[in-house]
Amino acid sequence: MSLSNAPLGQHVAYPSQYDPGLLFPIPRATNRASLQLGATLPFTGVDLWNAYELSWLDARGKPRVAMATFSFPADSPNIVESKSFKLYLNSFNQTRLPNAQALRDRLERDLAAAAGAPVGLKFISPQRFGELNMAELDGIYIDKLDIEIDTYEPAPQLLQCAPGDEVEETLATRLLKSNCPVTGQPDWASLQVRYRGRPIDRAALLKYVVSFRQHAEFHEHCVERIFGDIMRACQPRQLTVYARYTRRGGLDINPWRSNFESAPPADVRTARQ
C-alpha cells in the first residue's frame, strides 16, 4: 500500500463500530532497502506499542477500559501505520463484546494479519493501574556535553571512536527528535545505546543523534538507521539501540534492536511518556 492512501495526515471520520479494515500495513522492506538491509537482519528486536485509551462495551452496554502493550517482532513483514492503529482501537469504543477475552482474540487476530506475524499482547486492567511504574532509561547521559551543532539531517560521518581499550557501557540521551514522514509533526524520544567494543566518542554520538532533528522517518526506521550507522562507524562487537518515543493519539512506540540481547528491558515508561 502507498502512504498516500494511509489515514495519517488526512481527515478521517472516527468509526462507530469495530472495523479491522482500518489497519494500514506498511512493508518494512521498503525502508530497509534504503538502509541496505536484506532478508537476513543484523539484529533481532521488537516494537513495543503502549495503548492508553482502550475501551469497549460489555454485553450489557457498560463501558470497560484497559491499557495494553503490543509487541511487534522486528522480523514481521509489516509495521502498522499509527493513525490507522488508533482508529482501529477506537472502533471498539461502541462495540459490545461478551468479555475481555473476546477483545483479546480480535486484537491478536487482526494485528497478526496486518503485521504478517504473531503480535504479543499484554492487557493491563484498571485494578493494576496503580502498580505501573515510571523510570528513565539507564545509562550515562551525554546531553550536558558542551558542543556546537549545526547539522540537522542524519550525518553518519559524524560518528567516530575515541581512543582507549574496549569498553562495555550504556549511553543515553533525551535529545532525539525526528519527524513524521507524512504530517511533519515532531516525534520526541529518549535513546539508549548499549554496546561492547571500541569506545564511541560521546560528543560525536550526541551530534549524530541531534542530526535527526529535521529528518522525516518513522520511529522504527530511525532506530534501525541508528543501529546500522553505529555498526558501520565503530564496529562494536555487541550493540543494542532502544528508543522510547512520546505518546501521540493515545499510543507510544518504543523500537528495540540488538545483536546480542535476547529480549528488551521491562516496558517502563519515561517521564515524558
UniProtKB/Swiss-Prot annotation:
Enzyme class: oxidoreductase
Gene Ontology cellular component annotations, sorted alphabetically: cytoplasm
Binding site for NADPH: 82-83, 248-249
GO BP of this protein: queuosine biosynthetic process; tRNA modification
Localization: Cytoplasm
InterPro entries, A to Z: GTP-CH-I_C/QueF (IPR043133), NADPH_dep_7-cyano-7-deazaG_red (IPR050084), QueF (IPR029500), QueF_N (IPR029139), QueF_type2 (IPR016428)
Keywords: Cytoplasm, NADP, Oxidoreductase, Queuosine biosynthesis
Catalytic residues (UniProt): 180, 187
Binding residues annotated for substrate, in chain numbering: 80-82, 219-220
Primary localisation category: cytoplasm
Catalyses which reaction(s): 7-aminomethyl-7-carbaguanine + 2 NADP(+) = 7-cyano-7-deazaguanine + 2 NADPH + 3 H(+)
EC number assigned by the record: 1.7.1.13
Pathway annotation from the record: tRNA modification; tRNA-queuosine biosynthesis
GO molecular function: preQ1 synthase activity
Pfam families the record matches: QueF (PF14489), QueF_N (PF14819)
Described function: Catalyzes the NADPH-dependent reduction of 7-cyano-7-deazaguanine (preQ0) to 7-aminomethyl-7-deazaguanine (preQ1).
Family matches, as PANTHER family: NADPH-DEPENDENT 7-CYANO-7-DEAZAGUANINE REDUCTASE (PTHR34354:SF1)
Family label: Belongs to the GTP cyclohydrolase I family. QueF type 2 subfamily.
UniProt subunit comment: Homodimer.
Name of the protein this chain belongs to: NADPH-dependent 7-cyano-7-deazaguanine reductase
Organism expressing this protein natively: Bordetella parapertussis (strain 12822 / ATCC BAA-587 / NCTC 13253)
